[in-house]
């Protein structure tokens, strides 16, 4: 290993995980609820997903520490609000 060079770790994601992460980052400034992604996104590919698929992939992204979640009130229900972590915000990982 060369001195002064930091190797950026790589994370392999599925197409749907990349899509959700991209929409969350670009359209929602890094934070949104699952139903909010479906309702307010302009991405046609994302709109083809079900809420169950979005939730499942968000949980996998959370397991990989790429998103975090916090319980908040959304339209009268308590749901997870998903936010990108600093790894994504500061591009500390390479997404494959």
Predicted features and spans:
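Short intrinsically disordered terminal tails
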Residues: 1, 94-96
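Short alpha-helical segments that sit at the start of domains
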Residues: 1-27, 31
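Alpha-helical hairpin
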Residues: 12-13, 49, 84
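Residues at alpha-helix boundaries and short interhelical turns
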Residues: 28, 45-48
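Short acidic, hydrophobic short linear motifs in intrinsically disordered regions
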Residues: 30-42
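Short amphipathic alpha-helical interaction segments
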Residues: 47-64
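Short, cationic-aromatic polyanion-contact patches
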Residues: 72-94
């Amino acid at each position: 290993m060369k001195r002064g060079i930091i190797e950026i770790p790589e994370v392999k994601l599925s197409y749907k995980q990349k899509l959700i992460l991209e929409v969350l980052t670009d359209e929602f400034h890094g934070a949104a609820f699952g139903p909010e992604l479906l309702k307010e996104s302009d991405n046609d590919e994302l709109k083809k997903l079900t809420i169950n698929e979005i939730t499942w992939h968000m949980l996998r992204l959370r397991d990989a520490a790429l998103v975090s979640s916090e319980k908040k009130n959304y339209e009268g229900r308590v749901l997870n609000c998903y936010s990108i972590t600093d790894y994504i915000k500061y591009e500390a990982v390479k997404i494959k």
